[in-house]
Swiss-Prot record:
GO terms for molecular function: RNA binding; zinc ion binding. It is found in: Nucleus, Nucleolus; Nucleus speckle. InterPro entries: WD40/YVTN_repeat-like_dom_sf, WD40_repeat_dom_sf, WD40_rpt, Znf106, Znf_C2H2_type. A zinc finger (C2H2-type) spans 20-44, 1813-1838. Interacts with KNOP1. Interacts with TARDBP and NUP107. Interacts (via N-terminus) with RBM39. Interacts with the SH3 domains of FYN and GRB2. Transmembrane segments: none annotated. Pfam families: WD40 (PF00400). This is Zinc finger protein 106.
Amino acid sequence: MPVGRIECPSSPSFPRDISHECRVCGVTEVGLSAYAKHISGQLHKDNVDAQEREDDGKGEEEEEDYFDKELIQLIKQRKEQSRQDEPSNSNQEINSDDRRPQWRREDRIPYQDRESYSQPAWHHRGPPQRDWKWEKDGFNNTRKNSFPHSLRNGGGPRGRSGWHKGVAGGSSTWFHNHSNSGGGWLSNSGAVDWNHNGTGRNSSWLSEGTGGFSSWHMNNSNGNWKSSVRSTNNWNYSGPGDKFQPGRNRNSNCQMEDMTMLWNKKSNKSNKYSHDRYNWQRQENDKLGTVATYRGPSEGFTSDKFPSEGLLDFNFEQLESQTTKQADTATSKVSGKNGSAAREKPRRWTPYPSQKTLDLQSGLKDITGNKSEMIEKPLFDFSLITTGIQEPQTDETRNSPTQKTQKEIHTGSLNHKASSDSAASFEVVRQCPTAEKPEQEHTPNKMPSLKSPLLPCPATKSLSQKQDPKNISKNTKTNFFSPGEHSNPSNKPTVEDNHGPYISKLRSSCPHVLKGNKSTFGSQKQSGDNLNDTLRKAKEVLQCHESLQNPLLSTSKSTRNYAKASRNVEESEKGSLKIEFQVHALEDESDGETSDTEKHGTKIGTLGSATTELLSGSTRTADEKEEDDRILKTSRELSTSPCNPIVRQKESELQMTSAASPHPGLLLDLKTSLEDAQVDDSIKSHVSYETEGFESASLDAELQKSDISQPSGPLLPELSKLGFPASLQRDLTRHISLKSKTGVHLPEPNLNSARRIRNISGHRKSETEKESGLKPTLRQILNASRRNVNWEQVIQQVTKKKQELGKGLPRFGIEMVPLVQNEQEALDLDGEPDLSSLEGFQWEGVSISSSPGLARKRSLSESSVIMDRAPSVYSFFSEEGTGKENEPQQMVSPSNSLRAGQSQKATMHLKQEVTPRAASLRTGERAENVATQRRHSAQLSSDHIIPLMHLAKDLNSQERSIPPSENQNSQESNGEGNCLSSSASSALAISSLADAATDSSCTSGAEQNDGQSIRKKRRATGDGSSPELPSLERKNKRRKIKGKKERSQVDQLLNISLREEELSKSLQCMDNNLLQARAALQTAYVEVQRLLMLKQQITMEMSALRTHRIQILQGLQETYEPSEHPDQVPCSLTRERRNSRSQTSIDAALLPTPFFPLFLEPPSSHVSPSPTGASLQITTSPTFQTHGSVPAPDSSVQIKQEPMSPEQDENVNAVPPSSACNVSKELLEANREISDSCPVYPVITARLSLPESTESFHEPSQELKFSVEQRNTRNRENSPSSQSAGLSSINKEGEEPTKGNSGSEACTSSFLRLSFASETPLEKEPHSPADQPEQQAESTLTSAETRGSKKKKKLRKKKSLRAAHVPENSDTEQDVLTVKPVRKVKAGKLIKGGKVTTSTWEDSRTGREQESVRDEPDSDSSLEVLEIPNPQLEVVAIDSSESGEEKPDSPSKKDIWNSTEQNPLETSRSGCDEVSSTSEIGTRYKDGIPVSVAETQTVISSIKGSKNSSEISSEPGDDDEPTEGSFEGHQAAVNAIQIFGNLLYTCSADKTVRVYNLVSRKCIGVFEGHTSKVNCLLVTQTSGKNAALYTGSSDHTIRCYNVKSRECVEQLQLEDRVLCLHSRWRILYAGLANGTVVTFNIKNNKRLEIFECHGPRAVSCLATAQEGARKLLVVGSYDCTISVRDARNGLLLRTLEGHSKTILCMKVVNDLVFSGSSDQSVHAHNIHTGELVRIYKGHNHAVTVVNILGKVMVTACLDKFVRVYELQSHDRLQVYGGHKDMIMCMTIHKSMIYTGCYDGSIQAVRLNLMQNYRCWWHGCSLIFGVVDHLKQHLLTDHTNPNFQTLKCRWKNCDAFFTARKGSKQDAAGHIERHAEDDSKIDS
C-alpha cells in the first residue's frame, strides 16, 4: 500500500491545502480539492489533451530514439546486471525491504488514510504538490523545485544522479520519501538528464522489471542507478512496502505510461495523447516529483525511476489514491464511472463509480481471456485512456507528477522528441512513473473533482486499489517499455511482466484502451526495442490487436506496446490467460501494495516468467489439474522464452508448488504467485524480497484496506496497497477486476461475478462455469481486442484442457474463492486459511452459519480437490482437500511453496472476507483456518496438502478444545507481528497473511510471494464477493459470471458442472464436517470462555455446595448423629440428586465408556453444552474410567475428596485439550496418594449420578452449573493445573450444586461425594457399587459419595461421623477458603498432594490459595481431592463469593443458596468460606477452613474433638485446632493481621510485629525495628520453603524479616508512609500515603516501578486480579475511588466509583471487587466493566475488612461487630461481637475469625454458620453466632447499666425490673437466660 512512502511526506510543503499549479493550464489552485476540481474540469482536460498531443509527438520520438539507442543498450546491460544482481539484490533488499515495507506500510497506513481522503493531496503532498508547484517553474524547475521530496531524494545519487541518475535514483528516492526527489529532480532537471535517466533508467527499468527494483537500481549503468538502487533500497527502507513499491513503481510507471497510452487513446492521438499525457505527467511529475518527470523522458526509465521515487511514493501514498483515481478516472472515462466499480463496492462513496474499474477490469479480463498481454496492454491503454480522460482530473491531482513528468518530458523532450518511439515509450514510461503519477496526473487533471477531494477520503482504499491497478498497469507498462526498449530478449519478460500488470490494470480500467495502448506500445517497442522473434511475433499479434484497438496510439508507442505485448503475447500464447490473470492479480497487487507494485514491477520485469506464471496460474485456476499440466507447459514455454531461464526456475518451482499446493486452484494461485514471485526473485529478487517484507507488514495493513475495498474492482489498487504477494495480488486483482469488469462487459462482469461468487459463495459449479465462461469470454475479449490469433490460439491451446476442466483457469484461480458457493465455500476455498480463521476467530458467530457456506465455498473453489475433500471432516478446508486431489500433480512441487501458498491463500481469503465480515463467521473460520494454515505451513514445510489437511483438522480438533484462546493467541501474535489487523477479522486475516509470509519464509521469497499471492487471489475473490456481498448478491454476481460461463466453452461449463457436483457432494460433507468442526471449535472457544466463567461459577457453586453441605452438617450437628439425620436433612435435596446420580451411576456402570460420550453429548447439553460440555466430557470420561477402577480404590475413604481429584484428573485428562492434562496428572498423582485408600468408584458414582443429580438439582443448580462451568472454564483457562484444581473444586462444588453442572460433573460428583460424604456418613448401606446404581434414588448419590468417602466417613464416624463429615466439609471448605488466598501468589504447599490430613489442608490451603491466585491447582489438587477442590473451592469460595457477588444475578448462585436453605448452607458454608476468606491473607490459614466447618459443626456437638483430630492430621505442624480466645501483647491498635504457617502475625501501632501460636495463643516472637507505627504486614513465601515478613510503617520504610530467625533482612526506604502491602506474581506492591504504588521483586527485594495512582490522596488498600492475560492491580484510595490498573505498567484501565468516603479495604473475587468504605457500606463492582453490581448495607460504622468465603461475605466494622452476609441475597446471616473496641483488622482461618482491635486486643472466635442465636429484643434482628456475644449485646446495647427501670423487651416477655429492687443482677440473669434459652434458631 502506497502508505509506506506517504508516511513521510517528502516535506510539509505538500499539505493538502498547499497551492497546486496546473502547468497545463497555468493555473494555481489552493488545496487538493480545488486542484482536483480544476483537473476534472473540461478546460483543464482540453489543455491537457492539447499538451499531451504535443508531448506525444515530441516525447514519443525522443523516447523511441532514446530507447532505441542508449536505452536498449542500457536495458541490455541492465538486464545482464539485473539478472546477475537480482539474487544478491533480492536477498539483500528483501531483508531490508521486508523490514522497510513493514514500517513503511505502517507509516503509510496513516498516510493511506490521508490518501483516502486526499490521495491526490497525498500525491501532491509528495512530489505531486511540488510537481504542481513546479509545473509553473517548468519541468526542470518542477523537478528541482517541486520536490521537497526531490530534496529528500536530492540527497545522494538517487536524488541527484541527474535525471537519468536522479530519475533512477530520484525515482526510487522519490518514492522513497520524496526525500531525494528534490535533489534528484534538481540534478536531473535537464532533458539530458532525462535521456541519461532514460538510458540508465531503462536499463534500470529492465533489471527492475526483470529482477526487481533494487537490482534494477543496482544494475543501473549510471552510478546513479546504484544510488537509485540505494534509493530504491532506501525507498524500500523508507517504506514498509518498499519491496512492493519498486515493483509498484514499475507498475506505476507502466500504468502511468499505460495511462498515458490510455490517455492518448482517449484522445485518440497516440502521440498527442502521449504528449498530453507526458505533459500532464510532467506537470504531475513535477508536482509529484522528478519521478514522473524522469519517467517522462524514458518510459522504461521513467517507470523505473519514477516508480522508485514518484511511483513508489505514489504507490504508497499517491499511488493509492492516484492509482485508484486513475483506475477511477480511467474507468470513469471509459464507463463514465469511476474505475472503482469494484472499489466502489467496498467504498461506495467513491466519487467515480467503479464501473470504469469494472469496465477496465472486465476489459482486462476479456483481453486477458484472449491474450493476457495483449489484453493487458489494451486494457491498460484503456486505463490510460480512462486515466487520460480522468487524468484531466486525476492529472491535476497528479499534476505534480504529471506536470513534472511533462516538464521532464519537456525537459527531456529532447529525448522525448528525439524519437516518437522514445517519446511514446517515454510517455508510457513516464506514464508508468506516472502510473503512480499518471494516476497522479489523473489526479491533478481530475483530482479536484475525482481524486483529490472525493477520492482522497474514500479513495484511500478504493483509490488505492483503483490507482494501484492502474499503477500496476502503468508500472507494468513502464517495465515493459524499459525492458522492451532496453533489450528485447531480456525485456520480453519484463515487458510482458510489466505489461501483464499493466494489462491487468487496463483490464480493470479498460480493455479497449489497453489494447490501443498495447498497439502503441507494440509500435514503440518495435521501433524502440529490438524484439526477439517471439517478441516480434507477439508484437505482430499485439500490433494487430493494437491497431484494431488503438490505431491512434503513436507508432512508437504502438511498437513499444507491441513489443511488450508481443512478449506478453508470446508468453500469453503459452499462458495468456495466466498472464492476464496474474497480471490482473499483479495489477491488484501493485495497486494494493507498494510492495506488490514492486513485485509487479519485478514480475513485470520478469513478465515472461511472471506472465507464464500468470498464464499457468490462471490456467491452473481454470482447471486445477489441467492447470498444473498447463502451467507446466506454460512454464516450460515461458522457460523457452528469452526470460525463461528464470521463469523456468520459477515455473519449476511453481510446478513443484503446484504439486505441493493443496489443490489446483490453490496451486494456480500459489503457482501464479510463485511464478510471479519467482520471476521476481530471479529477475528482481530484490523486488520480491521487498515484496515479502512489504507483504508481511504492508500486506497485513493493506490487507485490511483491501478487505474493506476488495469486493469491488478498486480492490485491485487496494490489493497492491495491501502489499500482498504479487501472485496474491494478481489473483485478487483478477477477482477484483472481474468484479469491476462486471459493469463493463458481460464476460468482464462475469469475471467480477466469478470473483465475487467465490466470495459470495455461490454454487461452485456456477463459479466454475462462470470462470470457465469468463476465461472464454476473456479469450473472446482478448481475441476481439487483440485480433492476435496467436494469443487466442495460445490461450485456447494452453487453457483448452483447463477450460475443459474449468476453462478459465486464471479465472478459476480467481474462482478459487468464487468457486465457493457459500461463505462456507469461501472458507473451503481458504481451506486451511479458513481453518486458521476458524481457530482464532469468532467461532461462536462463525461456526454454524458460516461453516457450511464456507465449506462449500472452499469445495467450489477447489473443485478438483473437492471430491477428495468432501470426505474429509474439514472439507471446508478445501485447500487441503484439493491438495490431496492434486497431490500427485503437486508432488513434485516443494511443499514449502505449497504451504506458503496455502497459508497465503488462506490469508488472502481471510483478508478478503475479513474486511467485509470482520466479525463474520467466515472471518472467524478463516482466521482459524489461516492460523491453522500457518501452523501447517510452519509444521509441514515439506509435507503435502493431506498432512496439511490433517493438521488443519488436528488444529481444528485442538481448537475445539483449546484453540479458542490458543488459536486466538497464535493468531493474535501473528496479527500482532503483522500489526496489520485493525479488527479481529482483519487481525485474523492479517495474522494468516503474516503467517503465510512467515510460513513461506521457509520457502523462497518468490514462493512466499506466490503463496501470499495465492491467498490474495482467494481472498480477493472471497473478499470481493463474500465479505462485502451477501450470498445472494454474490450469487447474482455469479449469475453475471454465468453470462461469461455461457460465453465460456461448453467443456468449461461441463467441467464446472462436474466440479460443482463434486463440490456440492463434498460441500455437503464439508458442511457437516464444518458444522461439526465449528461446533467443536465454537464449543471449545465458548468452553474456554465459559471455563473462565465456570471457574468463577464453580467457585460460587462450590460455595453453594458448601452451604448445602453445611446444611447437611447442620442437620448432622443438630441431631448430632451425623449418619442418618444429616443424610435425611440434606438428603431431601441430595436424595433426588442421588437418585439422579444413582441412575447416572448405573448408566455409567452400564456404559462406563459410552457414558463419557453420552456425557459429552447430553450431559454437555444438559449442564453446559459449550464450556462445561468439554469439561463435562473430560469429567465424564474420568468418571467412567474411575467407574471401571472404582472397586480398586475404595479402600481409602478418608480421601473422599481425593477420589474426586482423581476423577478430576481423569476429567482433566478428558479435558486435556482444555489443558487439564497436567492438572489431571497432578491430581491423579495426588489423588492416588490420597485416594489410594479412597474408592474412586464412589467418585465415579457420584459423577455418574451427577448428571442426573444435576438434572434433579437442575433448577437450583443450573445456575450453579453455569458458575461451575464458568469456573471450570476459568480453571482450565488459567492453567492445566488450575484446571485440574478447578475441576476438583468443580467436582466438590458441583457435587451438590453442579448437578446441573455437567461441565464440572466429575468435580460435581466428587463434590457431591464430599458433601454427601459428609452428609451420608450415616449412609453406610450404599457401599457396594452394585448397590449404588440400584439402591439409590437417595443412596446413590450418598453411596457414590460415601463410597468415595465411605471409609473416610466410617473413620470419621468412629471419631464421630459428624466430625468426620465436618472435617471433610471443612477440608473442602478449607480448599474453598484456600481459593481465597488466590490473591497471594504463593503456591507454597499446594503441591503437597500427599498430605490429606489437616496439616495438608492447611498447607494445601495456603498453597492452593496461592495456586488459585496463580490459577495453578498444582499438586494441591493432588494433595487431596478435597484439597484440590478446596483450593479451587477456595478460589471458588473467593471466586464463588466473588462470582456470587459479581454475579448477583447469577441464578445458579441464588438458586443454590435458596435451594440449599440459604441460612444453614450459608452458615456451614460461611464457616468454610470464612476460612477461605481468612486465607486471603495467608493461604495456609485458609486451609483451616475445613476445621472451621468442622468446628462450626462441632461447635454444636462434641464432634469438635474428633474434628480437631482429623484437622490435626490435615494441618501440617499443627496437631491441635486453633483455639478460641484472646491474644495478648499489643499495647496499641492492631492494624493488620495475617495467618501464615499456622502462626498469627499481627502488627500494631506500638511499632512491633508479633507472632502468636494459634493453638496456645501465646506470643512466640516479636519483630522490632520500626520507628513508627506499623500499618501493614505481609508474610509470603520467597524461595523454596523460606518465608519473609514484610512490614510497612509510617516511618517510610518496609522492613523484610526472616520469619525463622526474626532478623531484619532488608529495609526498603520509600517516599512516604506505607499503608498497605500486597503480593502476587512474585511482586510486592506497596501502597503509600502519597498515592503511589511501589513494586518490588520479592526474590531480591529490588524496586521495580512506581505507579502514580491516586496522588495526592493515599492508597488505602491493594488487590490483584487478572483480565485474560492481563494482570490487574486494583488500588483503593482515600479519594473514594478504586482504580483498576495494568499491574505491569500501572496504566489506568478503569475507575470504580460509588463510595462516598475513603475506601478502607478490598477483596477481589472472580470478576468482582468487594470494597468496604467509611461510608458504612460494601460495594461490589465488576472489575472488567466497572459496573457497580451490589451494595451491602447494615453497618453502623466504617467497614475495615471485607472477606469472602464461598457464598458469604464476612465484614469487620468499627462498630465492633463482625457481620456475615450472604452474597447473593445481601442477607445478614450472622453477627459476631464480643469486642471491646473498634475492629481494625480481621482474618479467617480454619473457621476461626481473628480480629484485631483498636485497643490492641486480638481475639479468635469460631465462625459457625450453623449456630444462630437471634436477638428477639424488640426492634432488633441481629443473629449472633455465639451466645456470649448475644448476651454482651443484650447487656450493652439493649440495657442501660444505670437503668432505673428496665422492661424486658424480649418477645413474649413482659418482665419489669427496677433498680430499687436491686434487680439489676436479676435483669442481667433474666436477659442472659433469654439469650441462652430462647435465642437459638434452628438452622
